Design a protein with these regions (language model features):
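Conserved PLP-enzyme active-site core in the AAT-like
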Residues: 2-177
Length: 177
């Protein structure tokens, strides 16, 4: 997450859900980006944060037209799914890339009874933490960038090269296979 969030420049605004993973906070600090917090709906019966809909994102984009990207966690740690399709439509309307932390949804693409992956719903990039639900070793994850993404792929590659080791763990890489 830190790698992708080092793409925004200092002072640029990023809409991010308030219950994001701490690595996203690290990425915001490294990049110097300014978070614009979106609070998910609350599920009082469960005492957990719920979903986010496109209306909340559109409201924030209207208030912050200079936003550089939107970052949403979907699903939450508790398994709550947001309306990624409506969020994606709003982001496309405003020309802002949508990035999704789909850490706990890495296997969704392989079962028709599970929610659709954010890439199919229009996200520009998705991070899958295969060590959480995919069976790979801890610390292993994948970044997927959509073919029609509006992200600057060369900037993402530069950020990855800046922050990644030149000696990656072959055991971790093999466990992703």
């Amino acid at each position: 997450f830190e790698q992708l969030l080092s793409v925004p420049k200092k002072g640029q605004k990023v809409i991010v859900n308030r219950n994001c993973h701490r690595s996203i906070l690290t990425g915001l600090i490294i990049s110097g980006a300014e978070p614009i917090w979106v609070c998910p709906n609350r599920i009082e019966d469960w005492s957990v944060w719920g979903n986010i809909d496109g209306g909340k994102i559109e409201e924030l984009l209207k208030q912050n037209p200079d936003t550089s990207m939107v970052w949403i966690t979907n699903p939450t740690y508790e398994g709550v799914v947001s309306d990624i399709k409506s969020i994606s439509n709003v982001c496309k309307k405003y020309g802002v890339p949508l990035l999704v932390d789909e850490a706990h949804g890495c296997l969704w693409n392989f079962n028709k009874h599970l929610p659709e992956t954010a890439l199919k719903l229009g996200a520009d990039a998705v991070v899958h933490s295969l060590h959480k639900t995919g069976g790979s070793m801890s610390q292993s994850s994948m970044l997927h960038i959509a073919k029609d993404s509006c992200l600057d792929v060369s900037a993402v590659e530069k950020a990855l090269k800046l922050l990644h080791t030149t000696s990656p763990s072959l055991m971790l890489l093999a466990s992703l296979d």
